Amino acid sequence: MARVLGIGGVFFKSNDPGALTAWYRDVLGLDVQDWGGVVFTPDAMAAHPGAATVFTPFESETTYFGPSTREFMVNLAVDDLDGILAACARHGVEATVLPDQPNGRFAHIVDPDGTKIELWQPKPMAG
């Protein structure tokens, strides 16, 4: 039976894609390619046991995406949450750090387009 292998990409609209791409490059250190996108390779996630790509619909009434009014939230797995938060602070980006969870550490920021970004430092799975 044919099956989906995983997420092949996330594509979204922006009123100023160039400025938004620069923000992700400058604030979060994403390696933006000449064509304007970022490629995440499987080996980067594989190097961090416990990391995974999750696809989850939320109830339409959820407040978890707040303060954003966007219909989606992006979760970015990171290898050093404290380091990313320090970079955010240097760029004037406010972050909300959540209590540690069994699957890792989380913080929330909002990008210039108003999209909530969840930063996740995975905790290794119990073996």
Q: What residue ranges belong to the model's regions?
A:
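Core segments of cupin and vicinal oxygen chelate
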Residues: A2-L5, F11-V54, R90
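General N-terminal targeting signals
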Residues: T21-G29, P57, F72-V74, H91-V93, ...
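Short linear motifs in intrinsically disordered
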Residues: L28-D31, A77, V97-P99
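Conserved short beta-strand elements that form part of the metal-binding/catalytic scaffold
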Residues: G29-T69, I109-V110, K116-K123
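Vicinal oxygen chelate
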Residues: M1-N15, W35, D43, S60-G127
